[in-house]
Amino acid sequence: MEISTPDFGFGTEDSSAQQSANRAIPQPVPAPAFPLKETASDTGGTAPTFGTLQDNINELCLRYQTVCSEGRDGTGGGGPPGGGIRKDAFADAVQRARQIAAKIGGDAATTVNNSTPDFGFGGQKRQLEDGDQPESKKLAAQGDCEYGPRGGAPAAPPERSGPVGDPPGPPRAERGRRPPPALTGGALPSAALPPQLGPMHPPPRSTTVTEEYRVPDGMVGLIIGRGGEQINKIQQDSGCKVQISPDSGGLPERSVSLTGSPEAVQKAKLMLDDIVSRGRGGPPGQFHDYANGQNGTVQEIMIPAGKAGLVIGKGGETIKQLQERAGVKMIFIQDGSQNTNVDKPLRIIGDPYKVQQACEMVMDILRERDQGGFGDRNEYGSRIGGGIDVPVPRHSVGVVIGRSGEMIKKIQNDAGVRIQFKQDDGTGPEKIAHIMGPPERCEHAARIINDLLQSLRSGPPGPPGHGMPPGGRGRGRGQGIWGPPGGEMTFSIPTHKCGLVIGRGGENVKAINQQRGAFVEISRQLPPNGDPNFKLFIIRGSPQQIEHAKQPIEEKIEGPLCPVGPGPGPGGPPGPAGPMGPFNPGPFNQGPPGGPPPHQYPPQGWGNTYPQWQPPAPHDPSKAAAAADPNAAWAGYYSHYYQQPPGPVPGQPPAPTAPPVQGEPPQPPPTGQSDYTKAWEEYYKKIGQQPQQPGAPPQQDYTKAWEEYYKKQAAQVATGGGPGAPPGPQPDYSAAWAEYYRQQAAYYGQTPGAAGPAPPPTQQGQQAQ
């Protein structure tokens, strides 16, 4: 018998009670194969799954089966079967199914119209027949019932048990995929759902990107920082992993790998750009808290290799003063494995104008070092910070300091200044003595130092000739033949270093001649003392050319040149050589001064290495007579200097044109060499035969002057009259010589007996013999 299906009131809008009553009720659906149970989704526990949806659909079918059975028994009447309670139960089951579908499908559930009813969770899923899921899941996901069109015949009951299988009706290929009319009301709004069953949104996927970025190769050290401090801070602040390639491959830029989210990568790039901009001296960016929490402008300047010590100073004194004066913080960035011969970055942190001022101060220090004591300096050196810098040859620093600092202390006390030698890398030919104090006192101290250095380069003056100006200052620190007056310099070099000066095939000497404009050659003469361990070299040219030619030679022998001396002065006879030098051995350690010790030319204690600076002695009237006759002074000097038996007074030479015995020292043993007339004649002949160098000043011939000079001296001595003739016997200089050597012995810690040779005998005794 056919029973009309009651209308439950949740069909389409055109449905009426009469049509619902006339509708045939399908056969009852068998009970589900597994019992219904409450799931976690009913209590808001775990997230719903397709299995949960399957359970609720089974419950829905079971309740619908109950409704159909009651309607078939005739208990439903014309209204809804079971009254409002059953209708509410069925609607509740449908609502629960929709909620679970919305929970699983999220916002994918769509509202459909009446003409095309569909599940909210099925519109976006593909056909499951082609899926790769197991068969049981395919059936469970497809639904439990199929309903025919309204007004049609009731469908046959299903042949299989279990609500999850194929529902009764036509074959799968002919069946539509429409849900029951009660399920076509669309998805519930999310506001109507409980919080635990609200629409689910898939969590955003974490996107990680890797990007290659390039930075200047010279800025890699700044990016890494000391001990990796900088790069670690970049990674922590940006959340991006930063990896720098170990080598640039010779390219000006180095690759940097940035790994992280797009936002982190972008932030890391901004931080890298900011570091590079600061390293190039550009304006600071928004990331400026890089240097140990120091805010402000950060600028990096590169300090050339070997000059970092100038900026740091002794014990960090210079860099501390720079920081205090400029009000900034300075940090040297140096890796422990970094080569010491590469430039080092100096990081300056502070206010913009203070950083700029500090940079200028550092560059001033570097420029002063590059000038090396020359540049735009005045007579005594360039003025820096209210003082004066005086360049001192490196081999003469010990002379300025003196033994145990006696000389430099005396200069400081006399001038009222403070003198300090600047620290350097030790490669330059000079060292800078910085004088601090009032300007006029600094100039006075600089004048003393320059006079001291000049006295090292020049020997003490000889005695004045009678009626003529004083003789020229003897050059050099060793005994030997005097060179011509200007345009030439003779010096000795150890034999084992001559090859370094000459070079292979004479290439070094040729290069000096071409580049310096002077003419350098080796002399065939033996050294003055006949020592085979030394060779004589001659440099000819202008004074400037000679000075330029000396520099490469001193570099080759790693020491200063010791000139034998220039020619005699235009007035009187030249003074003898000063103390011996390191390459000019003499017969004894300390050479006598340029003349006997009358008050006009007091003895000065310039030693081999550390001199004793003495002020001029006061005027002594008792020695005035000794200064009246220069011939007597020369006689006493040469009798002691050459340690020879007393001979005739130098004012009575054997020949009128022969000068007194002065030139060559005796060959060992120093006896039996009393007549050097022929040697002097040969010397002056050579001078007259030497060709003039192009551009050199013309050499004067003093032969006739010397002849005339000694003729006058001989005539005065023979007649016993004339100015300057001694009224009686010649004065005795033994006491003066003894005092001179006592001073030297006291300075060098020697006993008076070991200071040197014995003083010469009295002139009276010499005349008596």
Curated annotation (Swiss-Prot):
Signal peptide range: none
UniProt biased composition (Basic and acidic residues): 126-138
Chief location category: nucleus
Keywords carried by this UniProt record: Cytoplasm, mRNA transport, Nucleus, Repeat, RNA-binding, Transport
Compositionally biased region (Pro residues): 196-205, 563-585, 645-671
Subcellular location: Nucleus; Cytoplasm
InterPro entries from the UniProt entry: FUBP_C (IPR015096), KH-I_FUBP2_rpt1 (IPR047372), KH-I_FUBP2_rpt2 (IPR047369), KH-I_FUBP2_rpt3 (IPR047370), KH-I_FUBP2_rpt4 (IPR047371), KH_dom (IPR004087), KH_dom_type_1 (IPR004088), KH_dom_type_1_sf (IPR036612)
GO terms for MF: mRNA 3'-UTR AU-rich region binding; mRNA 3'-UTR binding; mRNA binding
Region listing for Disordered, in residue ranges: 1-48, 108-209, 456-490, 558-628, 644-769
A Pfam family of this chain: FUBP_C
CDD domains in alphabetical order: KH-I_FUBP2_rpt1 (cd22479), KH-I_FUBP2_rpt2 (cd22482), KH-I_FUBP2_rpt3 (cd22485), KH-I_FUBP2_rpt4 (cd22488)
Function: Part of a ternary complex that binds to the downstream control sequence (DCS) of the pre-mRNA. Mediates exon inclusion in transcripts that are subject to tissue-specific alternative splicing. May interact with single-stranded DNA from the far-upstream element (FUSE). May activate gene expression. Also involved in degradation of inherently unstable mRNAs that contain AU-rich elements (AREs) in their 3'-UTR, possibly by recruiting degradation machinery to ARE-containing mRNAs. Binds to the dendritic targeting element and may play a role in mRNA trafficking.
Record-given protein name: Far upstream element-binding protein 2
Organism of origin: Gallus gallus (Chicken)
Top-level taxonomy: Eukaryota, Metazoa, Chordata, Craniata, Vertebrata
Gene field: KHSRP
